[in-house]
UniProtKB/Swiss-Prot annotation:
Pfam families found in the cross-reference section: ILV_EDD_C, ILVD_EDD_N
Summary of the function given for this chain in its UniProt record: Functions in the biosynthesis of branched-chain amino acids. Catalyzes the dehydration of (2R,3R)-2,3-dihydroxy-3-methylpentanoate (2,3-dihydroxy-3-methylvalerate) into 2-oxo-3-methylpentanoate (2-oxo-3-methylvalerate) and of (2R)-2,3-dihydroxy-3-methylbutanoate (2,3-dihydroxyisovalerate) into 2-oxo-3-methylbutanoate (2-oxoisovalerate), the penultimate precursor to L-isoleucine and L-valine, respectively.
Gene Ontology molecular function, alphabetical: 2 iron, 2 sulfur cluster binding; dihydroxy-acid dehydratase activity; magnesium ion binding
E.C. no: 4.2.1.9
Cofactor(s) listed: [2Fe-2S] cluster; Mg(2+)
Cofactor mode of binding and number, as noted: Binds 1 [2Fe-2S] cluster per subunit. This cluster acts as a Lewis acid cofactor.
Positions with a binding annotation for Mg(2+): D81, D123, K124, E491
Organism of derivation: Buchnera aphidicola subsp. Melaphis rhois
PROSITE patterns in UniProt: ILVD_EDD_1 (PS00886), ILVD_EDD_2 (PS00887)
Entry keyword annotation includes Amino-acid biosynthesis: yes
HAMAP family, per the entry: IlvD
Recorded catalytic activity of this chain's protein: (2R)-2,3-dihydroxy-3-methylbutanoate = 3-methyl-2-oxobutanoate + H2O; (2R,3R)-2,3-dihydroxy-3-methylpentanoate = (S)-3-methyl-2-oxopentanoate + H2O
Keywords, alphabetical: 2Fe-2S, Amino-acid biosynthesis, Branched-chain amino acid biosynthesis, Iron, Iron-sulfur, Lyase, Magnesium, Metal-binding
Name of the protein this chain belongs to: Dihydroxy-acid dehydratase
Length: 613
């Protein structure tokens, strides 16, 4: 019998008490010879992306049992960023990532589980689970709940696709009729699943494919489609195979750190840049890499952003395409195949299927595959019926989107730009870098100069926008919203969406040491590092200061002399205990958030905790 981790609690006379407790959960003596596989679920009725996961843990557990393993399910917390948005609840979102990772470590190590299968979906849950996977480095597969279908409404007798961002945008527009706002509210999120655009949740689920830790189709196959059930069944069977191979044959090739290597992280970031994904993915990939002791930094991201083309625009960067359309065009595998054609990928990396990337693309690229089952899977589309139940429909597109000139995925020859949809800027405001989603910035705004209008909280900035105090040419500065200063690094979806509803999104810039929702577009620059609370120079900006932003040259610059900058630093330090703190902000910070703030590092380090011993 192989030496499973779980033998610590299942073998030997001295473990009679532990075995007695295991038996009380339904295990038998025969089960003690099998691998114990943790089914790490994240079901909650608070989140549409997780509302349908309750029974999916049971589905996977049954497959594990049939394949010769013992499944033991537990749950993590899951916060809905959309519901937590716009109030103090958003302070808790990013810190929950660390709690999720820690809770998984606690459960896995306390009970000596042999492997795990992670059922994730939304914003901080997938990153938290990935952090745990790299930290623990035991056999692991990711399977997500899948994206929801896009909403559809008719305006002027024409059907248009909508999503959550439309509900926020139209409700903030004083010119929108109440009936229209109500219609959009009722139609924006029609089914279970992660929101239908390429926001943080779907970006991260796509990246699990690129990292090699999930099955092809995981990031794009709709939650409502019957084909997604096949992914769950396949994942449940595969985790047992991988686990037994590791413990019986000492095959370490499919352990998380050997799959998600430095080369895999570079591939994942290249995918993210090519599809113009959420800027949050940068934050999370840095944190996940750190857990695996993988050398992956902002410098790598900066280098990739200058050579990886922008090949795909999905909502919120497009009003035409949503995740269902990305899937029809070949999804993650289709986009990776385009990057592979121009030699921008590391091909000799493995995935949970035990295949290298080149072989995987030969099988799953819709432009070249001969496999009818693969073609059929990528034809899986939306049915257009409201539901919170998964696997309820089997609609298929009449044909695939293979148009690489004007379709959802473009070839290099027809790229939106030769450098990608994300960029890292540096300058005296952000010595350690900051992030902008160029996919959401119009060409006219790639170079922008404006005067600062400074706020020390998101709430004050929102109030100023809604009261009409923001003018064309302003650079809105929202500081003390970083990991430490917030604390919790709030998302700035409401300020950016309100700017859009006021018609100012292409005439202003917004810079912050906070972060942005994956639904953000416009000239929105976040993750400024060091943050204000860590003595970053964003704390020194004054109203009316001139700020220069040059995305092609990767520069963000406060237009003052170096002598003036040094003087401002000196004056700030004279404030003693009040230096580098928000002076006028009133905000309750709970003990739990204070603990996170005490350990939190700036965004260029992934906003992870620096544990001091």
């Amino acid at each position: 019998m192989p030496k499973y981790r779980s033998s610590t609690t299942t073998q030997g006379r001295n473990m009679a008490g532990a075995r007695s407790l295991w038996k009380a959960t339904g295990m038998t003596d025969l089960d003690f010879k099998k691998p114990i596989i943790a089914v790490v679920n994240s079901f909650t009725e608070f989140v549409p992306g997780h509302i349908h996961l309750r029974n999916l843990g049971k589905l996977i557990s049954s497959e594990i049992k049939l394949t010769g393993g013992v499944a033991k399910e537990f749950n993590t917390i899951a916060i809905d960023d959309g519901i937590a948005m716009g109030h103090s609840g958003m302070l808790y979102s990013l810190p929950s990532r660390e709690l999720i990772a820690d809770s998984i470590e606690y459960m896995i190590n306390a009970h000596c589980a042999d492997a795990m299968i992670c059922i994730s979906n939304c914003d901080k849950i997938t990153p938290g689970m990935l952090m745990a996977a790299l930290r623990l480095n035991i056999p692991c597969i990711f399977i997500s709940g899948g994206p929801m279908e896009s909403g559809k409404i008719f305006i002027n007798e024409k059907e248009i696709k909508i999503d959550l961002i439309d509900a926020i945008k139209y409700s903030a527009d004083p010119n929108s009729a109440d009936d229209l706002v109500n219609q959009i509210e009722d139609s924006s999120c029609p089914t279970c699943g992660s929101c239908s655009g390429l926001f943080t949740a779907n970006s991260m689920n796509c990246l699990t494919e690129a990292l090699g830790l999930s099955l092809p189709g995981n990031g794009t196959l709709l939650a409502t489609h019957v084909d997604r059930k096949k992914l769950f069944i396949q994942a449940g069977r595969l985790i047992v195979k991988i686990t037994k191979d590791y413990y019986k044959n000492n095959n370490e090739n499919l352990l998380p750190r050997n799959i998600a290597s430095r080369q895999s992280f570079l591939n994942a970031m290249s995918l993210d840049i090519a599809m113009g994904g959420s800027t949050n993915t940068i934050l999370h990939l840095l944190a996940i890499a750190k857990e695996g002791n993988i050398d992956f930094t902002m410098s790598d991201i900066d280098s990739l952003s200058k050579k990886v083309p922008h090949l795909c625009k999905i909502s919120p960067n497009s009003t035409t395409y949503h995740m269902e359309d990305f899937h029809r065009a070949g999804g993650v595998m289709g986009l990776l195949a385009e990057l592979n054609r121009i030699n921008l990928l590391n091909k000799n990396i493995n995935n949970v299927l035990g295949l290298n990337l080149e072989t995987t693309l030969n099988i799953y690229d819709i432009l070249t595959t001969k496999d009818k089952n693969i073609i059929n899977m990528f034809r899986a589309g939306p049915f257009g019926k409201k539901t919170i139940i998964p696997f309820t429909q089997s609609y298929r597109w009449p044909k695939l989107d293979k148009d690489r000139q004007k379709g959802c995925i473009r070839s290099y020859e027809f790229a939106f730009s030769n450098d990608g949809g994300l960029a890292i800027l540096y300058g005296n405001i952000a010595k350690n870098g900051c992030v902008v989603k160029t996919a959401g910035v119009k060409k006219d705004n790639l170079i922008f100069t404006g005067n600062a209008i400074v706020f020390e909280s998101q709430e004050d900035a929102v109030r100023a926008i809604l009261e009409g105090k923001i003018q064309k040419g302003h650079v809105i500065v929202i500081r003390y919203e970083g990991p430490k200063g917030g604390p919790g690094m709030q998302e700035m979806l409401y300020p950016t969406t309100y700017l859009k509803s006021m018609g100012l999104d292409q005439h202003c810039a917004l810079i912050t040491d906070g972060r942005f929702s994956g639904g953000t577009s416009g000239l929105s620059i976040g993750h400024i590092s060091p943050e204000a609370a860590s003595k970053g120079n964003i704390a020194l900006i004054k109203n009316s200061d001139c700020i220069n932003i040059n995305i092609p040259d990767r520069i963000i610059h406060l237009d003052i002399t170096n002598d003036e900058l040094l003087l401002r630093i000196e004056n700030e330090n004279k404030k003693g205990s009040l230096s580098y703190t928000p002076l006028y902000r009133q905000r309750y910070v709970s003990p739990a958030l204070k603990m996170y703030a005490f350990f939190a590092m700036s965004a260029d380090k992934g906003a992870v905790r620096k544990i001091r011993f």
